[in-house]
Amino acid sequence: MLMLMLVAAVTMWLRPLVTAQLCRSRTVRTGKVFNLIQDVQGDRLYFHPTTTRLIKHPCEKNIALYLGKQVFFTMDNFETSLLPFTIPTSMQVGVPEVTSAHFAGSLLLLVVDQKVYIYDYENNSWSMSLGIKHPVTHVSGDNCCYTGSLFCVHVSNLVFAYFRGDQISQTYIYYSNTGGFSFWKYHYDRQAEIIGSLGGIFHFFSLSQVAMLVVNQGKGMFKYSDHPLNRSFGLSFDYNGTLDILIAPGQRGILLLWFENSLLFSHNAGQLVDTVRVKKGDQTLFSSIFEAKITIHNIAVTENELAVITREDNLYYGNLGIVPSSIIKFADQYIWSEDVALMFRSPGTLEILTPLRDTAFPAFDFQKCLVNIQALLMDPELHVGKCKIEFLTGEFIYRMYTIDMHSQLELTASLIPQPGTSLIPLVMVSNPHSLGFQATFYENGYTSDGNTKYKLDIFLKQQQHWGRTDSNFTSSLKKATMSTLTVDIANKEISCVDIKPLSTLISVGCDLDKKIVIQNKVSACSMGILDPLTLQDNYSFIIEKEFYDPGFQGQQSSEDLHVFYSYQQLGCPLLVYYDTLWKPVVELWRKDSFQEVIDAEYVLLEVNGQFSYSYSLTAQSAMCTSQPQNWTTMIKEFGGPFFWNRENYVSCHDPNNNAPLRWPDVQYQILGGRTANQIIFGHNGFYVFYISIVDPYYSYCQLETIFSIYVYGAFPVQLVSAGVVILLIISSILGSVWLAYKTPKLLRTARGRRIKKCATQLCRRCKTVCQFRASATARAGTEPPGRHRTPHGGRSDH
């Protein structure tokens, strides 16, 4: 009996010792020696649920928000004592209860008392979101952490605001593309027909879909917005409580759905949702959290890891991969309290955070317990297998790529297994509806200690261009999408904490490095017609009122237009002869490298409203099967010029275009593509053109630019109309014929003979005068200079 008591005492003494070695606790207490921290000012925020939340900024690793009985905001990972987070009383929030929070770039969005408030932590300022007219309880969004990408800025700025639990057919949903500053009503397709309550609405960028969680009769399922997933719901799953949905960072499509008695996992943005299993080694102990009778208090999620702390004072850990997710239980530890929360500091390093109230100061201290996951996994009682991966890397990690229309991408990864083991690599794309790939895995030499090195070559392009999928599977080719590429190892052991999956974000959309340039081999300056120095010296020209319309409708203006020529923007104009059918040679450039001559469809518009040019083809001669678009109709439809682009262009050769061909003789104003349409000029002078590539299948970019030409060689404009000129010519001919007929008859009369006699005498006199002047000129040429005979025989000096 004495021996048993001694063993029990030793066991109880060793247990906290082991716990201390695995989880080293320390208390953060700062700013209290000299009482530097001020009192709490404003309305103190709080979070009502019995569980806690700790939201880390996905990109700024030191910024986080703690939600519990008190709310704390930190910019240094809780390394200083903090006052409870408050909102200024001037905001007049009413009940300062926080129901949802989200980081949108450098902004913190908080739903307080069913309204959305914005805290700009960089400028320490508060504001209220505009445009929300109805109560909301939650906000949702995502963050993209690739720096220097406009696409990432767009991702971070998109936010939804909604009332969770409302009937979908009657609820109001709001969206923002300004990071939460302004919201607009969001109209989900056929929303009024959806039966069920709203569990949330999210923009899954990994799938390029807006997804709505529909809850009905104890089942949840995601409904998607766009083809091809909008034809049906995702697979249903048990919805036994109000689930919080966490989108794992990295845009890989990983979701965690949880409440106190349930933990669900999806690796494809909600299309398939499964329970998280509880395992010990390779053995599955429980198929779900509910079956294991676990009560979750808080969870922490990164791109690849998951940690769970329960009210039963247990800590669980798992990794997030393509296989069904599972967690393992670590040794029992005294770590739980009603205020405890979890957060990952780095891969394999977990921090257990507990706010500590100070009776003497208003600022709270923080107890931090740092857990080394790798050390815990080495416990032989966990039966965790040894990691079989020695090395896994790729040059594409931490980078973002773009695949434009008809483009392709090649990436490589390197892999070295542990000696005596073999591995199977997994290559996955989060959006197979828009991005396809082909991978090759092969040996690539040996390491210095004899291990085999392997290389993985991945060739990617748009799924539609592989030619091996049905149109019912692929997304719309006209729509820009995105996908995440992930390289991982099949059946990877949970002990591979430091071997993270290789992941990169691929935008199937506009390559921002692309631009169009108009070929200008023969310019007005190189041919000597215009002087570049003159063009640079505030040069201007006049467009006569007969040849331009400021409204771009082809109507004459009331006054001439004085135009300044921007040489810095336009350079020397391209030279065009008026009597030649013409169209520009459009070149595609990427950065400073020429790519190709563009043969896609495009449109031109003279930016000053000139209309003294026409097109060589009509709708009929261009073989249109439907009425073609033109600048007149597009300007009327969109309220101004320069809005004709790939987004609104509809080809008159498209068999799906049902617009009847009512006016076949109208000018066909689209150049390039399948037609030989060209431009005809009838007037000399400067033309400054706006060009836009409208072919939706050439590039996802809005390729546009302006350029100038100089037309020469046209005849001067007639001041008298052609009808008047023709009338005068005909009158002259008729008058000549009449005189030829009438004159002979007139000469036979007495009056005619007198006229004839006078004319004869006049001719003789003119002949005599001419002979005299000719002889005088001849004599003057034979005498010495300065002297000639006078008519009277004398001499005259000059």
Swiss-Prot record:
GO biological process, any: spermatogenesis
Record's keyword annotation contains NADP: no
Disulfide bond annotation, renumbered to this chain: 23-369, 59-145, 144-152, 387-496, 510-701, 525-572, 624-652
Protein keywords: Cell membrane, Cell projection, Cilium, Developmental protein, Differentiation, Disulfide bond, Flagellum, Glycoprotein, Membrane, Signal, Spermatogenesis, Transmembrane, Transmembrane helix
Signal sequence coordinates: 1-20
Mode of membrane association: Single-pass type I membrane protein
Residues modified by glycosylation: 123, 230, 240, 472, 538, 630
Compartments in which it is found: Cell projection, Cilium, Flagellum membrane
Entry's transmembrane regions: 724-745
Function: Auxiliary component of the CatSper complex, a complex involved in sperm cell hyperactivation. Sperm cell hyperactivation is needed for sperm motility which is essential late in the preparation of sperm for fertilization. Required for CATSPER1 stability before intraflagellar transport and/or incorporation of the CatSper complex channel into the flagellar membrane.
Protein name in UniProt: Cation channel sperm-associated auxiliary subunit delta
